[in-house]
Amino acid sequence: MHHRFTPPMMNCKDTAIQLLSRRDHGQYELKQKLTLKGYASQDIESAMHFCLEHGYLDDLRYAKSQIRQHVGKGHGERRIRQELSLKQVSDSVVENAFAEEPQDWFELAKSVAMKKFNGVKAKEQKEYAKQVRFLQYRGFSFEQIRYALNDKA
């Protein structure tokens, strides 16, 4: 008869460190993951305190990494801010992260539009509206969209 080996459950701190070794997490995201794994809230608080103290958990570093990741996906500033807000990263941390990760949002919007629409300018209002909606969904402002879709751009 074969018995399946089940490894002993790791303690909360080790699990947190293991999660953070794979990629940066925000405080809220890490807390959610540890809660889902069934750890007690006092163990989670203790593990998070340890990770913060030792620099393993850093919301600013996490926010900057999220900005780089989303820019790589062709997302605009508004979309990125919304995603960080959903992950409960504080407004001040988000502001600092954007200050430390400067982007040319106008050129990014233009690049995304060129890639998506193959440089083809909309000939009809309906097509233009479709292009605008796409770029809005991606998180670009109206000024950035106008720049990206401008014939002279």
Swiss-Prot record:
Subcellular location: Cytoplasm
Predominant location: cytoplasm
A single cellular component GO annotation: cytoplasm
Keyword Cytoplasm included in the entry's annotation: yes
Key words, A-Z: Cytoplasm
Record carries keyword Chaperone: no
InterPro entries (alphabetical): RecX_HTH_1st, RecX_HTH_2nd, RecX_HTH_3rd, Regulatory_RecX, WH-like_DNA-bd_sf
GO biological process, one term: regulation of DNA repair
UniProt cross-references to PANTHER family, sorted A to Z: REGULATORY PROTEIN RECX FAMILY PROTEIN
Family to which the UniProt record says this protein belongs: Belongs to the RecX family.
NCBIfam families per record: PRK00117.3-3
Function noted in UniProt: Modulates RecA activity.
UniProt protein name: Regulatory protein RecX
Source organism of the structure: Vibrio vulnificus (strain YJ016)
Gene name as annotated: recX
